[in-house]
């Protein structure tokens, strides 16, 4: 069985998005991209991104197509990972999706958790496909070897598969896991691993708090996060690109989970998962499908900065 990336839609042009270093008060200005701006207050945009920690002691496991460790926005924080495509430790990114996810979660300019450590787990090939058994092996490796405190993000999805679901369920008992809801504009409960209730399944929104037009929905969607026209690092260079999709949204959630783990390193993974759902802004989104929770991702500390 072949699983594919939950595709993100690329804008026509690449972009360069250079951010100034965060000040001592931990506020990104310049301004930050809209996704970062949106998740640190309950309503609207204020052209700032506030964060209470840079999560330097948290590890983000990116189970995807690898990560471009040489991209300057990662600042040498990409640690040795594991390659389940060919065996060994080559986790370079020939697709670009994993680099982008890692950047939205944890890069200096584009990322939520700006100093988190990054470990690539390569399970997806250059064409965006991967064998289910190798994906499961990569997930199991993180379950068995995660350096705590840690979080994980997967950018994959496919037809229902009990074995894949079981692997993600076991991982979610060890680290908080962010999953894309998928981009078929249908019920996310039809797909694996997005239907795993122990993980955080994430739909996408735009800068106007509208649910993304292709975002999946349903009871298994735990919350929404920015996922339309979101910038992140481009593999094989020093700049960035703009992408859209629920993978982008899941990467935001992984970054916020890293912030939470940095502030509460001894809290168990399932409790972190619940905390992120509880922190979400409720009933601020439009276009939410009936039967889907109207929750928007928020960073820890947002309640002190009500917008």
Model segments located where?
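N-terminal export and membrane-targeting signals
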Residues: 1-12
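Active-site-adjacent mobile loop/cap segments within catalytic or ligand-binding domains
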Residues: 241-242, 258, 274
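Substrate-binding/specificity loop regions of serine endopeptidase catalytic domains
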Residues: 129-135, 153-222, 229-254
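Protease zymogen maturation seam
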Residues: 7, 15-58, 72-73, 288-307
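Subtilisin-like serine protease catalytic core
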Residues: 32, 48-80, 88-134, 146-151, ...
């Amino acid at each position: 069985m072949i699983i594919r990336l939950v595709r993100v839609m690329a804008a026509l042009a690449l972009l360069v998005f250079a951010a100034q270093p965060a000040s001592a008060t931990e506020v990104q200005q310049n301004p930050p991209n809209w996704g970062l701006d949106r998740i640190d207050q309950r309503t609207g945009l204020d052209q700032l991104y506030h964060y209470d920690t840079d999560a330097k002691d948290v590890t983000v496991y990116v189970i995807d197509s690898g990560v471009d460790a040489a991209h300057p926005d990662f600042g040498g924080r990409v640690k040795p990972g594991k390659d389940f495509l060919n065996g060994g430790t080559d986790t370079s990114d020939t697709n670009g999706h994993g680099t982008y996810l890692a950047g939205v979660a944890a890069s200096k300019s584009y990322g939520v958790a700006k100093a988190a450590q990054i470990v690539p787990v390569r399970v997806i090939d250059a064409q965006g496909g991967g064998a289910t058994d190798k994906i499961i092996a990569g997930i199991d490796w993180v379950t068995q070897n995660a350096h705590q405190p840690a979080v994980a993000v997967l950018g994959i999805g496919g037809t229902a598969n009990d074995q894949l679901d079981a692997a993600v369920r076991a991982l979610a008992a060890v680290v908080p896991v962010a999953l894309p809801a998928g981009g078929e504009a249908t019920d996310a409960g039809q797909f694996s691993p997005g239907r795993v209730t122990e993980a955080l399944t994430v739909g996408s929104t735009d800068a106007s708090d509208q649910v993304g037009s292709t975002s999946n929905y349903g009871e298994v969607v735990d919350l929404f996060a920015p996922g339309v026209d979101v910038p992140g690092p481009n593999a094989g260079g020093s700049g960035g690109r703009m992408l859209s999709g629920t993978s982008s949204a899941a990467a935001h959630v992984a970054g916020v989970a890293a912030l939470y783990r940095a502030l509460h390193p001894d809290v168990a993974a399932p409790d972190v998962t619940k905390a992120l759902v509880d922190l979400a802004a409720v009933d601020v989104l439009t276009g939410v499908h009936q039967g889907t929770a109207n929750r928007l991702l928020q960073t820890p500390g947002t309640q002190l900065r009500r917008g």
